[in-house]
């Protein structure tokens, strides 16, 4: 689920925004946030894929309620969205991009743990980190 969403974001957002090395302007950030709506529209055309829409819509919600698009908090964020949020952020940190070097797995794990309970579901972060340490999550 995560990879197709990342590819969709790349298809719908201008490269000048995706590869920008400096801070996004308010306008660019608003454009970047449209990938949630665009992804949802694309999924509606795929047979038998409606079940992933809550995860797609909610993957930028934050556990403390400060995310978007609806400002949901805690258990009100769909379960799969809470998982996707962790995977998406971990990938964003550990993947090399044209505008940044990949961060180490150790650094990414520390960031997940540091933001556990605010940005991320603390129970799911703990499980995600356990799976990394057990070698059950493949890291490319």
Question: Where do the PLM segments sit?
Answer:
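Single conserved hydrophobic/aromatic residue that forms the stacking wall/gate
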Residues: 1-9, 13
């Amino acid at each position: 689920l995560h990879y197709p969403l990342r590819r969709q974001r790349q298809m719908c957002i201008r490269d000048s925004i995706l590869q920008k090395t400096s801070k996004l302007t308010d306008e660019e950030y608003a454009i970047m946030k449209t990938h949630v709506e665009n992804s949802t529209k694309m999924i509606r055309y795929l047979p038998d894929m409606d079940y992933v829409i809550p995860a797609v819509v909610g993957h930028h919600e934050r556990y403390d309620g400060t995310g978007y698009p609806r400002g949901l908090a805690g258990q009100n964020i769909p379960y799969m969205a809470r998982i996707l949020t962790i995977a998406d952020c971990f990938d964003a940190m550990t993947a090399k991009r044209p505008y940044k070097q990949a961060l180490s797995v150790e650094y990414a794990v520390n960031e997940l743990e540091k933001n556990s309970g605010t940005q991320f579901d603390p129970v799911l972060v703990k499980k995600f980190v356990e799976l990394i340490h057990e070698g059950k999550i493949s890291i490319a």
